[in-house]
Amino acid sequence: MNIQALINDKVSQALEAAGAPAGSPAAVRQSAKPQFGDYQANGIMGVAKRLGTNPREFAQKVLDVLNLDGIASKVEIAGPGFLNIFLDETFLAQQADAALADSRLGVSAAEAQTIVADYSAPNVAKEMHVGHLRSTIIGDAVVRTLEFLGHKVIRANHIGDWGTQFGMLIANLERIQAETGEVSMELSDLEQFYRESKKLYDEDEEFAVKARGYVVKLQGGDAYCAEMWKKLVDVTMVQNQRNYDRLNVSLTRDDVMGESMYNHMLSNIVSDLQTQGLAKESDGAQVVFLDEYKNKDGDPMGVIVQKRDGGFLYTTTDIACAKYRFEELGADRVLYFIDSRQHQHLMQAWTIVRKAGYVPESVSLEHHAFGMMLGKDGKPFKTRAGGTVRLADLLDEAEVRATQLIESKNPELAEDEKKTIANTVAMAAVKYADLSKHRTTDYVFDWENMLAFEGNTAPYMQYAYTRVASIFAKAGISMDSLEGEIKITEEKEKALIAKLLQFEEAVQSVAREGQPHIMCSYLFELAGQFSSFYEACPILVAEDETVKQSRLKLAALTAKTIKQGLSLLGIETLERM
């Protein structure tokens, strides 16, 4: 149950009954401090101002018709017109019992939509680097959350598998085969292979001519070029899948929807834009002029959809892509997890898409932009030599550091268990350090912070789960064999339950806003509430069996909520660390 939404509806009804215009926002939020109740309605002052009435007097009118029977024990008018809402203890206990009995922990299923999520999108013939990390893990966390709510999610890994660079790659592949009769296509060699191809293209005119010829042949469907191109794609995706599997990211080869997939649509789209009068010839190119964007002279900005040589641009592909996702995939929402520097490019493509009628306004096109990963010097994260950090190297280092950490904390563990724990902690640390930051901000990558057992980190959250689970292991009790009802006898129990019952609010916020840090913050606060409860309320040595069973139920619901929340982030838990 989403208690915030329930109370918001009740306050909205009361607002209208008290004379507010229909649809006036109740603006119910979680209270910042316990003395202000569990929830606070903040919308009354704004409505009173529009009505020209005293906010506190209007708040009293709302309170007179507000029906929170069985939900709130007390509602107070505070300040200039806030409503502080204190939840009823019986209501809280009943909802906690219901959540524990439910495999979904009380989270209601949403009205199912078809949602396309575009994320990760590495380039072919190049290794994944740290710049791909944010799109990959943020997108995957949101996808997992949407699926948990019951949506049909189509993962779209929009890989860079097309373009003029493939001419030089195929030409170099042919050169190596002619010289050696064999070519190793291990991806560790492919990064070097790409650099070598580029050098030849830049410095050897004969090679460059051949490469440009292969571009034309590949675009024309030449069988040999297509075979070489497919080999490059296959080799790249095998290596990428290793990274996905290590990171516990749910993408597979079946989710690849590369740029090449839309090639057959591009010429028809340009023709249609011309027919609609949207695309016009300008200096030999086909250009769409957008009044919504101005150039430096204040004139409508021109967006090229076809170059004078007949070639198409990324914008053309993105127009086709959005059209395909609506017409062929039936998308209700399309989420693009692409870095913030691409924002104007996407907005221009979507403006054209809307003007052309390819995607109706009822379908939501959303750019979930993200900031950069920075080094401690505040500059983009690089190797010591100033080069790009390979993602695989970053994950290797995380495992080495986590192994040292586990060795220092628990040296008596068996080697195989040590390795399992270290690998799980390593991947969790890399992911959580990113996911716990607001998506749109840059963040500093810091090994010491991300592997710390204090603060809002993966090791802390994994240990929080292990600590709760150990209560049951110590007592030899199963979380699923508890009896009796939850009873609130202490203030710390009530505070823990109130936080536990905010789980659905966190889940729905992540799904709506594409912001996984909301879940991280929620889980961190929950772990803190459990610590306070654990210190104040004895569990296994409680004064009687009824209280013991009730507190064990709260511990079980805490463990299950942390485990489920971390799972939605793509992070695994451990029974012991």
Curated annotation (Swiss-Prot):
Pfam family, one: tRNA-synt_1d
Chief localisation class: cytoplasm
Catalytic activity: tRNA(Arg) + L-arginine + ATP = L-arginyl-tRNA(Arg) + AMP + diphosphate
Family recorded in the similarity comment: Belongs to the class-I aminoacyl-tRNA synthetase family.
Subunit structure: Monomer.
NCBIfam families documented for this protein: argS
UniProt name for this protein: Arginine--tRNA ligase
Lineage, highest ranks first: Bacteria, Pseudomonadati, Pseudomonadota, Gammaproteobacteria, Vibrionales
